[in-house]
Amino acid sequence: MSDQTPQFGQTPSEAEPDAVALEAGRKLFAGECTFFHGTQRLDQLPPPMGVEIAFAGRSNVGKSTLVNALTGRKTLARASSQPGRTKQLNFFNLADQLVLVDMPGYGYAQAAKDVKEDWQGLMFSYLRGRPNLRRVMLLVDARVEFKASDIAVMELLDKAAVTFQLVVTKADAVKPTPLQRRVADVYAAARAHPAAHPHVFVTSSDTGSGIAELRAALAGLTD
């Protein structure tokens, strides 16, 4: 990446999909999307049924909210203001073309230790062993610097050779100059991890910024 980090609402050339790609993303995510499975146990995972995209991140980073924004549905994935509430893998079938996986949040210190270890163990085991997992979208809050748990997850994904892509959420909550610094830090993290995709998405589920581009990129993974 060059020294010029994209401002909020701007993206480098690889993230500027053409009209065909944008329309493909719009059509895919306008299709029927239904919840079909939730589990806290590896032995109860659904059989692989096509390309899976997992959404991971710290508790309360906005995973469920982003899934809802992508699909244009307010209540498809249950979002909670209470960090650590989502404790299972939730699977959504998008138009029989893509499976979206809303993962439990990690790094919430106030969760009971045994419960925290149980759901983080499930998450890590899923990431390492799911054969049809095409990409992990690793969400980071625009307002919060990287935590040790974020670094640990990126290192685990490197070790497991699971491709992940960083997505900045809640970008509308940060003023342009600090947002630019934050995005620069996230790009630096992407460069430092071999399993990371080089492009970072900067999004706001509230304003919709970056959502169309992310839809287009995810639709491209179904090819």
UniProtKB/Swiss-Prot annotation:
Necessary for normal cell division and for the maintenance of normal septation. CDD domains: YihA_EngB. PROSITE patterns: G_ENGB (PS51706). Its cofactor is Mg(2+). GTP binds at residues 57-64, 84-88, 102-105, 169-172, 203-205. This is Probable GTP-binding protein EngB. One of its GO terms (molecular function) is GTP binding. It comes from Granulibacter bethesdensis (strain ATCC BAA-1260 / CGDNIH1). Residues 49-223 form the EngB-type G domain. Belongs to the TRAFAC class TrmE-Era-EngA-EngB-Septin-like GTPase superfamily. EngB GTPase family. Mg(2+) binds at residues 64, 86. GO terms for biological process: division septum assembly. It comes from the Bacteria. Keywords: Cell cycle, Cell division, GTP-binding, Magnesium, Metal-binding, Nucleotide-binding, Septation. InterPro entries: G_ENGB_dom, GTP-bd, GTP-bd_ribosome_bio_YsxC, P-loop_NTPase. GO terms for cellular component: cytosol. Pfam families: MMR_HSR1.
